[in-house]
Amino acid sequence: MVHVRYGGQNGEQYELAISENHIVVRTESRSSLISDRPFEAAPVSPQARNILNQFELSTRFSQAGVEVLHVKEPSHDGALRDTAREILNQEPEVQFAGRVLIDPVSQQPIVYTENLFVKFDHEEDVSFCQEILGRYGLTIKRQLEYARNAYFVSAPSNTGLAIFDISERLLNEESVELCHPELVREFRQRQAFPPQWHLKQTTIGGKTINAHANVEAAWKLSDGTGTIIAIIDDGVDIDHEEFRSSGKIVAPRDVTRKTNFPTPGNRDNHGTACAGVACGNGNFGASGVAPGAKLMPIRFVSALGSQDEADSFVWAAQNGADVISCSWGPPDGTWWDDKDPLHKQKVPLPDSTRLAMDYAINKGRNGKGCVILFAAGNGNESVDNDGYASYEKVIAVAACNDFGTRSAYSDFGTAVWCAFPSNNGNPSQTPGIWTADRTGVVGYNSGNTNLGDQAGNYTNSFGGTSSACPGAAGVAALILSRNPNLRWDEVRDIIKRSCDRIDPVGGNYNAEGRSPFYGYGRINALKAVELALPAQPEPVSIFTAVQDVPINDLQISQLSLAIANTNPIKSIKVTVDIEHTYIGDLVVSLNPPAESGVLPIILHDRKGGGADDIKQTYDEVSTPGLTALKGKIPQGTWTLEVADKAQADTGKIRSLTIELGF
């Protein structure tokens, strides 16, 4: 074993094994030693070619001009490796043939160069840094401009594995802040692995599955980089190979145990699979919808409605979460049993949790709001009975199957916002969703290839709206990665507009295009990412009326504004400034010109209780009724109408501003 330490002398130490079955080779001509076209292979002696016939290409690092070879019949003594190195190093065409490191968990090859990254303390001067490097026989290749006193240096040829010893000795120098060898691994494009039919059209068991959310196509524009997805669930295996990359895990928390270690319990498999669906790296066996997003695992296994539940949302908001995914809620009825009494239960959202959600929505993302998603439920029952998923400020996600129709168990109702692919039951073309599982034999898959992969690191049958929810959460991260300036409700609106209307016959879509089974349809990730970019600036005119108009008890007050423009409206924002000591008394409406044919639009309907004043801007996202004005001619008199519906409190209208885009 060799060791490398990132983060300085007190940073985390990583162990790497020396492979018994790999060699790394560089030729003078940079030609490959093993090629599908023999005439393109580098020229070597018959003896060397005979030994090479016992190897196969593992990976190639074109930029470095090296390739990693792996023995066809692995051994445990490294004898063939050493023989090959000895023979190849005598070949004129071979610049070097060396040993290879492997990750002891993933068994992926890692090539060490004879280069080092070294960063000295800020206060050291250049001459002192150069003196230290010279003492170790190191040559400066570059002084790095992105960090003070940082250098990329090389050791003498044939230093070999001693480069790790040099690195550790340098770290022990009082003036050295950071130091580690240059290690290179295979670079892989983000990919949808073959069983991941929910990400792209694929073939499984000879069947073409085309019921995906168009995710792989979206990665050309966004992979979620720069965003953080919080998974509130039963814990996450943060040491899983798909979450283990540097910086992937952010602000882990166990709100039940009150620790920062969200380790799953013995039977807690759910959260790891959810996290994999949302944002698995996709480097080894399963990609998440947003592979570039960071993961904030929050373990919550306390009772529904507990304070721990509320604390989960506050933790997420305070620690930088952009998206919060919740694949849990009240118990579901048995989906195939119409008589199960659980179908009828109504579970309200506690005030403590609602206020915590509101905190995340109002304060998260520097005021732009966290996007909160909930699984609609798996009881084949009304989601409207579930106070969590039906809360008006969250996105309730239903499940659709590999036929492009409703998953049999998926909850339905007016609160369903969208659908995302998941498993079905019978009939089904696939076992379900392929995603990360707790490492080894402890998760859903104990190492059975009928259940996933042989190592037990992936499951092939995750499902339910539990899988659909983090899938949709991943799309929200793709959107915010593309345009981080969006508010939470703008993200929700983009998801709505991105949806494909699936199952047009059985979906029971209403005039607005909303289905009780799919909401606005199945999310199309590519379309969502395309919609995320800000629209091109359009000509804007701003019209304002300023006048103190008294608001008396049980009376109607009005402030009018004349607009002469005759261009069709493309967008509208309405800003009101109303002083009042109890805004729960008020109904505030915007009355467009009679010539427009648009009925009064309610902006505020007795919400807010005893709070003071309404100083707010309304747009087409926050107030969908305003969309009725698109295409209308604004010419005429606009009136802000305030109706006081109760006694004891009074106030006044201060101003009305209408911003129109043409």
Swiss-Prot record:
Question: What GO biological process terms are annotated to this protein in UniProt?
Answer: protein processing
Q: Where in the cell is it found?
A: Cytoplasm
Which stretches make up the P/Homo B domain? 535-662
Q: Which residues form the Peptidase S8 domain?
A: 196-529
Xref: Gene3D superfamilies: Galactose-binding domain-like, Peptidase S8/S53 domain
Give UniProt keywords alphabetically.
Answer: Calcium, Cytoplasm, Hydrolase, Protease, Serine protease, Zymogen
Q: Which PROSITE patterns match?
A: P_HOMO_B (PS51829), SUBTILASE (PS51892), SUBTILASE_ASP (PS00136), SUBTILASE_HIS (PS00137), SUBTILASE_SER (PS00138)
Any keyword Cytoplasm? yes
* Annotated GO MF terms: serine-type endopeptidase activity
The annotated active site, in chain numbering, is 233, 270, 466
Instruction: State the EC number(s).
Output: 3.4.21.-
Can you list the GO cellular component terms from the UniProt entry? cytoplasm; endomembrane system; intracellular membrane-bounded organelle; membrane
What's its top-level EC category? Answer: hydrolase
Question: What's this protein's function?
Answer: Degrades phycobiliproteins in vitro. Has a substrate specificity similar to that of trypsin.
Q: Which family does it belong to?
A: Belongs to the peptidase S8 family.
Protein name (Swiss-Prot/TrEMBL) = Calcium-dependent protease
